[in-house]
Every structure is written in structure tokens, then in C-alpha cells.
């Protein structure tokens, strides 16, 4: 067997330190150090303080972090109601009639959110959630204050910097830190926990679209941003007092090595207290946080996770899942008005006010996040993710038909259905990453995968707007079907690509890290068993291979096909785990990782 991949981290570190120049070496070393240590190390005093929340007045209970996380995410989700500000800002700030620019602010904010999550992920993982969360909310508030100044001065560039960049940085830090804190408390139901947390973010447009509409109608724009920012800051400041990390030993150290038949089990009442339970005063009569039973785990470093092809296949699948609704969310009022309202060739009132449609879309966004996350706990992350992509493919096929037959309710129903899938992707992706790469890598992996959000919001949004503007400049009207058929066509192709990528994601730790033979060409799992294709050179196997019995084998002049038995697979897997454990211990003793 070839176990060269076991020492990849050592090789990665050594090669990185042989760059040209001492300054470059120092920079590379700093970056490697930053992304190599992603675990929060609490002192004994901090663990003791975390037994109480809300300024030390209330004993912490695991359930408290979920409503606190929902409220915080709900405030951050106000960004989803940005479309209400587009027309008023364009009318106030536009430099020429018909010029649109406010929409770009939304794309910049979500783009910066993803980049901030990627850069700050390791820092968030290593720090207390109240610290990172407080920084996120302060920066988010500063973005609102800058936006108020920008609209007062009628400067689009300052608006892009204030709400787009500054508030986007606050969004990135606050979004990732809140989800990470909630996710760590519930190792047995990560999909449900993370879905509940991000449910608040998806529901932001549900309330804030109506609130923003009221502010626009009853105040001037600078005051609207001052009120909105101050209100969300005050609510988050109180809610974050209930956020704290779980006690030591609450989560498995690494990725749990499981068989498909294994399930989580609660500790029996007479089981001895774990270190985590003792740290939180697990005395008689005091319910301790539920603990998973002890199982074998496999430590996966962040560099291993990021160099895994499965991570990047999931990255493409995630990007594909969000791009459709992401461009629709910021353009829904315009779509309704152009296709079914006053912007039509024959103007009429739309069947539903646009701000209500945005609010209902937020409700479906919120519903999808929690329901899909919970469903993934029951039937598996990969299966559910494939279903989300498939539903969106069907939606994109029928949306142009709904537009062509002038059916508003069919159109809006399809959009809301896709919105459930959009929210569901966000709800389950933190749990998907934690299952695949370990809880200590979740913030970093989640932050980096959120750059797909950046790409989808900036590139996808700009492409959508660019297609519309190109048709308009060529003499088309905003109600012309061909504008939207063209846009939906390229989005459909992207989602199909994402579906194919998701098919090839190896969600199981065994499938990802099962040892490969030196002469192995490819490997896949068929009906629960490993099927391998081995190369044959000059009539001999391309590498040393030990005799195997019991497996089905077919040998030709160039390749050998092998279908392993369950027993052979288990033997090879146990040998790999044993070697991996020895390697990890040696590396730890040498202080390399």
C-alpha cells in the first residue's frame, strides 16, 4: 500500500519554507502557522467563567445559544432586504437619468462577506465567540453609519465602501463566528443546529423588507440607515451575551471514523462524567450537555482539507446552488414590476406588492435553512444536496415557461421553491464540512467556501445585470422575455455542472482516505464495495501488490479490475488507520504540527 499521503503536511511545510529570500520565508511561515492552528484553547479560568452567561448572571445551558444565534443572524440578515433601498438611492444619488448603481452595493457586501470569512476563519476558530462576534457587530454598525453619511453626501463610492466593504467585513466575521459557536454545541444534530442558526439570516428580509419600506416612506435615507444600524446593534449586543463555547471534550477530536450502521448514542445516566461534564459542574440533578460515545477518530489538518478534491467539488456545487436565488433576491422587485407590473408593455398593478413578495421569499429562505438542515441529519448531506440542485434545475426549466404564459403565481411559486433550496444549502453546508473535515476546521473551511458566495454575488450579479443592460442598450424593453431566458440559460448550465460535481464528492471519510496502491488508476464504490482499476505494465502489475484472496479480479494485458470484499476493505482500512496514528504521534512529538 502507498501511504505517502500520510506525511503530506510535513512535506507541505518543508517545501513552503524553501522559497527565495528570508522575508518571503517569514511570510510563508506566518501564513502556514496561521492556517495550521485552528483550535480554541481555553484557560481553566475561562472555562469556569463560561459556565455563566449574560454578564455572569445566568447559568449557561446548551439550548441558549440557538435562540441567541438566530437573533444575531436575523439582524445580519437585514442585508437581504437591501433591494428596498435600490430605487430610492438611485433616484437620490444617480448621476444621470436611468443610471443604476445601488444594486452594486449588495453584491459588494456579500462578496466581502465571503472573503472576510476565508481570511478570518482560523482567527475566529481560535478566539472566544463573544470576542469575534462583538468585533463583527461593531464593524457592521460602522458600515451603517458610513452608509448614512454616503447618502447624505450623495456619494455612491462612499456607499460602496461603507455598506459594501465595511459592513461586509462585519457580516463575514459575525456570520461565521455565530454559526461556528452554535454548531459546536450539537455534534449529534449539526444539520439542525446550523440550520437553525442561519435560519435567522435567511429570515432577515422577512421583517426588514417591511421595516425598510416604512423607514423609506417616513424618514429620509440617512436617518433610515442610522435607525436600522442602531437598532440591530442594540439587539445583537444583548444577544451575544448568551454565546459561549462548549466545555472541553464536548466534541470528537477529528473526523469520526464510522460505519454506515453506526449512530450517535446518549450517555446512560450511570455513565462516568467526561472531562467536559466535570468542567461544567455535571453534578447530580444538573443536566450536562449530551456527549457522543467515544469512537475512533481521524485527525484531518486544514491543509489536508483544502487540498482535497472533494472540498473543491463541494465548493463548485455550493456556488451552483446559490447563484440563481442570489441574483433573484436583489432583483425580485424589478422582475415583478417589469414582467407583471407597471413596467409591462400594458401597465397594470402586480398581483402582489413587491415588498410582500420579498418578505415571503425571506420566509421560504428561512424555512429552507432549518428544514433542509434537519433533513440532512436524517438521510445524509450528499443526498439532500443533490436533491437541492435537481429541484433548481427543474425550476429553471419551467420559469421561462411561466413568464411566456404570463402566469405570475406560477413564476413566484417557482422562485419561492428555488429559495427553499438556496436557504437549505446555507443551512447544511457547515454541518457537511464538519462531518467531512472535523469540527476544528469548520470555521476555516466554512469561511473559504463562502468565497463562493462572493463569486456568485459579484460575478453572478454583474453578469445578470450586464445581460439585462446589453439587451436594453440594443433597443429591447425590460419586459422582453429574451432577456431573462438568456440569463436563466447560463445559470441552468452552471447548476448542472454543480450537480455533476456533487455526484463525485466522497462524503465518507473512508472513501476519501482509503489507501491507494502505487499502480492504482481509479477507485469507486459500487453497491457498497470498493472497485479498483490497476495498471499493468509489461505483463506485470505496475507496482508491488500483495496477493489478495476472496476479491473478484479480471486481468487484461493493460489493466486489472478488482472488486474487494468487505473483509479485505476493512483490513486495508485498519492498517491505514494504525499507520496514520503512529505517524500523527511522531509528528506531534517532534513538534512539527
Language model features by range: what are they?
Residues 143, 156-173, 319, 409-424:
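Hydrophobic core of transmembrane alpha-helices in multi-pass small-molecule transporters
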Residues 138-152, 391-404:
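C-terminal ends and interior cores of transmembrane alpha-helices
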Residues 223-242, 484-504:
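Symmetry-related core transmembrane helices of the 12-TM Major Facilitator Superfamily/SLC fold
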Residues 201-258:
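Helix-loop-helix hairpin linking two adjacent transmembrane segments in secondary transporters
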Residues 104-124, 359-371:
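Central cavity-lining transmembrane alpha-helices of secondary-active solute carriers
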Residues 82-89, 297, 301-372, 457-465:
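Extracytoplasmic gate region of multi-pass secondary transporters
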Residues 89, 171-186, 193-194, 336, ...:
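Intracellular juxtamembrane helix-capping segments at the cytosolic ends
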Residues 2-54, 234-313, 512-593:
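Long, low-complexity inter-transmembrane loops of multi-pass membrane transporters
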Amino acid at each position: 500500500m502507498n501511504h505517502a499521503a500520510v506525511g503530506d503536511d510535513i512535506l507541505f511545510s518543508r517545501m513552503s519554507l524553501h522559497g527565495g529570500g528570508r522575508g518571503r520565508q517569514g511570510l510563508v511561515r506566518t501564513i502556514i502557522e496561521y492556517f495550521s492552528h485552528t483550535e480554541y484553547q481555553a484557560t481553566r479560568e475561562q472555562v469556569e467563567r463560561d459556565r455563566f452567561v449574560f454578564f455572569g448572571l445566568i447559568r449557561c445551558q446548551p439550548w441558549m445559544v440557538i435562540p441567541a444565534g438566530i437573533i444575531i443572524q436575523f439582524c445580519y440578515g437585514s442585508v437581504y432586504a437591501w433591494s428596498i433601498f435600490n430605487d430610492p438611492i438611485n433616484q437620490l444619488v444617480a448621476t444621470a437619468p436611468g443610471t443604476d448603481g445601488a444594486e452594486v452595493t449588495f453584491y459588494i457586501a456579500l462578496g466581502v462577506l465571503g472573503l472576510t470569512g476565508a481570511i478570518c476563519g482560523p482567527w475566529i476558530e481560535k478566539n472566544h465567540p463573544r470576542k469575534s462576534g462583538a468585533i463583527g457587530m461593531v464593524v457592521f454598525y460602522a458600515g451603517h453609519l458610513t452608509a448614512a453619511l454616503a447618502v447624505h453626501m450623495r456619494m455612491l463610492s462612499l456607499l460602496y465602501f461603507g455598506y459594501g466593504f465595511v459592513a461586509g467585513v462585519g457580516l463575514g466575521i459575525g456570520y461565521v463566528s455565530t454559526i461556528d459557536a452554535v454548531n459546536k454545541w450539537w455534534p449529534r444534530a449539526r444539520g439542525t443546529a446550523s440550520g437553525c442558526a442561519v435560519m435567522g439570516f435567511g429570515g432577515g428580509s422577512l421583517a426588514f423588507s417591511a421595516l425598510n419600506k416604512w423607514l423609506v416612506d417616513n424618514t429620509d435615507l440617512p436617518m433610515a440607515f442610522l435607525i436600522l444600524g442602531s437598532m440591530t446593534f442594540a439587539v445583537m449586543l444583548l444577544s451575544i451575551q448568551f454565546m459561549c463555547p462548549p466545555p472541553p471534550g464536548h466534541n470528537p477530536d477529528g473526523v469520526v471514523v464510522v460505519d454506515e450502521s453506526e449512530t450517535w448514542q446518549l450517555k446512560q445516566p450511570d455513565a462516568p462524567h467526561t472531562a467536559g461534564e466535570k468542567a461544567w459542574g455535571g453534578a447530580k440533578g444538573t443536566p450536562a450537555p449530551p456527549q457522543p460515545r467515544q469512537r475512533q477518530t481521524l485527525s484531518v489538518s486544514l491543509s489536508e482539507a483544502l487540498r482535497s478534491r472533494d472540498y473543491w467539488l463541494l465548493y463548485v456545487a455550493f456556488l451552483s446552488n446559490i447563484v440563481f436565488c442570489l441574483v433573484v433576491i436583489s432583483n425580485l422587485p424589478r422582475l415583478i414590476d417589469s414582467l407583471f407590473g407597471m413596467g409591462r408593455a400594458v401597465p397594470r398593478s402586480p398581483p402582489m406588492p413587491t415588498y410582500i413578495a420579498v418578505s415571503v421569499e425571506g420566509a421560504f429562505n428561512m424555512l429552507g435553512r432549518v428544514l433542509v438542515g434537519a433533513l440532512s441529519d436524517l438521510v445524509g448531506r450528499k443526498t439532500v444536496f443533490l436533491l437541492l440542485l435537481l429541484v433548481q434545475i427543474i425550476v429553471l426549466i419551467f420559469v421561462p415557461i411561466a413568464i411566456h404564459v404570463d402566469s405570475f403565481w406560477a413564476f413566484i411559486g417557482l422562485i419561492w421553491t428555488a429559495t427553499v433550496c438556496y436557504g437549505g444549502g446555507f443551512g447544511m453546508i457547515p454541518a457537511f464540512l464538519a462531518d467531512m473535515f472535523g469540527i476544528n476546521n469548520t470555521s476555516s473551511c466554512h469561511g473559504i467556501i463562502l468565497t463562493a458566495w462572493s463569486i456568485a454575488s459579484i460575478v453572478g450579479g454583474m453578469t445578470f445585470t450586464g445581460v439585462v443592460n446589453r439587451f436594453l442598450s440594443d433597443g429591447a424593453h425590460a419586459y422582453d422575455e429574451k432577456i431573462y431566458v438568456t440569463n436563466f440559460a447560463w445559470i441552468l448550465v452552471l447548476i448542472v455542472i454543480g450537480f455533476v460535481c456533487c455526484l463525485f464528492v466522497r462524503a465518507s471519510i473512508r472513501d476519501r482516505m482509503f489507501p491507494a496502491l502505487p499502480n492504482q488508476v481509479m477507485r469507486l464504490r459500487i453497491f457498497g464495495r470498493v472497485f479498483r482499476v490497476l495498471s499493468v505494465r509489461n505483463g506485470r502489475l505496475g507496482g508491488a501488490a500483495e496477493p489478495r484472496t476472496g476479491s473478484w479480479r479480471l486481468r487484461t494485458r493493460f489493466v486489472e479490475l478488482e472488486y474487494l470484499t468487505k473483509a479485505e476493505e476493512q483490513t486495508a482500512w485498519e492498517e491505514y488507520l494504525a499507520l496514520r496514528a503512529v505517524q500523527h504521534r511522531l509528528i506531534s512529538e517532534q513538534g512539527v504540527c
